[in-house]
Each structure stands twice: as C-alpha cells, then as structure tokens.
Regions:
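Short hydrophobic/aromatic beta-strand element in the GNAT-like acyltransferase core
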Residues: 108, 121, 133
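Short hydrophobic/glycine-rich mini-motifs in sensory/regulatory modules
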Residues: 124-134
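Regulatory sensory and allosteric helical modules in signal-transduction proteins
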Residues: 64-102, 106-112, 117
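Short beta-strand-to-loop transition segments that serve as allosteric relay/switch motifs
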Residues: 132-143
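A short, aliphatic-rich beta-strand micro-motif
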Residues: 117-125
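GAF sensory/regulatory domain recognition
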Residues: 30, 42-74, 78-79
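Amphipathic alpha-helical "output/dimerization" segments
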Residues: 126, 144-165
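Signal-transmission linkers at sensory-effector interfaces
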Residues: 1-27, 34, 148, 166-206
Length: 208
C-alpha cells in the first residue's frame, strides 16, 4: 500500500468512528515518522493563549521510546525567528538546527536535552488559512532534509486536512487561531495531492 493510501486509511478510520483522536494522532505521527525516516514526528496547531499566540502539540511520537511523549507549547513571543520563518516561508528546514537562525533559540531547553540535531517543520492549512504544522526531528546526528521530504509533509497535510481539523478541535482546551488571511501569499493548498508519482494510478486501479 502506498503512503497516500495509508494516510487515507488512517483518516478514514477516524471519520468512521473506528478510532478516537488519540489513536488517530498516534497512527498519523508514527506513519509520517516512517515516511520521512526521522527520530521524532509531531503535529502542532496554532492557538491563542493568555501568553499570546502559540503552537500546541497534539501528539509527538518518539521512535526511541516507541510511544507518544509530551511537548510544551511554543510561544511566538519566545520564538520570534522560528515563527517568522514558519509563517513567511511555510516551513523551517534546519538540517543543522543547533546553528540555524530560526532554531538556535531552542538549543539549551530543547535541542541539547533531547540530543536533537535537525528539525523540519512544515505548515498545513485549512480552507487556505495556516492551521498547524508537522515537525520532524532527528536525534544523534544531523540529517540533510530534502525537498522531497518537504513536499511529502505538504501532501500529507493536504490529504489529511479535514481529519486534522476534526481531531484537533475535539480537544476542549484547543481553540485554533486564525492567524493569517486566506489571501496570504504563503498559504498552502488543502486539496488532496498524491504522495507518490504512482499514487494516482493506484487510486484509479482500485477506486475503493
């Protein structure tokens, strides 16, 4: 089964009520970690808090522990360069996260304690408005992220956008923030797109 079909099946199980939101996020982050080949994978959503706008972690899968782990909110006020890059460019590609201008601020409190060397964060949108991001993290040694990996995360966000909205808004303390207008030039498309070159062909062969 192709990556695209796997993502569709995970979303379909949530839509049919066969899994709950926690199981959905667990399955999704594990699958994306396998697709990208990274140590950790998380799903975050933009929220408004008493301390200002932030990214809140819905789930963070850590391959080293083979389970979901906790992650603190990331606040715009504390992480200006990171937020600015993520919003303006739609992604943060930091193969050397310990020295990248957008992520060096995480060095002492996040990167060093978790032995993380590389970060790849890519926004996903709902109805044209940035809603959250996928984060991929590499521990032990640096990993040179590729454009293909960036595109894979964007396609996952496009394909899973409605399921992500459903799962994220099922959390009582999560009120998603509409941070930017749909006309923003860095908005991402939310229409489904193939993850692999042959994904569309497979769908045509098997319409179910």
């Amino acid at each position: 089964m192709s990556d695209g079909r796997i993502i569709q099946e995970i979303c379909g199980r949530l839509d049919r009520g066969e899994t709950d939101r926690d199981q959905f996020f667990d399955q999704l982050t594990r699958t994306v970690a396998d697709m990208i080949g990274c140590t950790r994978c998380g799903v975050w959503v933009f929220v408004d808090t008493a301390e200002g706008r932030a990214l809140r972690c819905m789930a963070m899968y850590d391959r080293r522990l083979d389970r979901i782990v906790g992650a603190a909110d990331i606040y715009n006020a504390d992480s200006g360069p990171y937020f600015e890059t993520l919003v303006q460019e739609g992604c943060v590609v930091a193969s050397d996260a310990r020295h990248h201008p957008a992520t060096v601020g995480f060095l002492d409190n996040y990167l060093l304690p978790l032995d993380l060397h590389s970060l790849l964060d890519v926004c996903f949108s709902i109805n044209g408005v940035p809603f959250g991001s996928f984060s991929c993290e590499q521990a032990g040694a640096a990993l040179n992220w590729t454009q293909r990996q960036v595109q894979m995360l964007r396609h996952v966000g496009s394909r899973a956008s409605l399921a992500l909205l459903h799962a994220a808004t099922a959390t009582p303390d999560t009120q998603p923030a509409a941070l930017w207008e749909p006309s923003s030039p860095n908005r991402l498309l939310t229409m489904p797109a193939p993850l692999d070159p042959d994904d569309e062909n497979e769908r045509r062969r098997d319409p179910t």
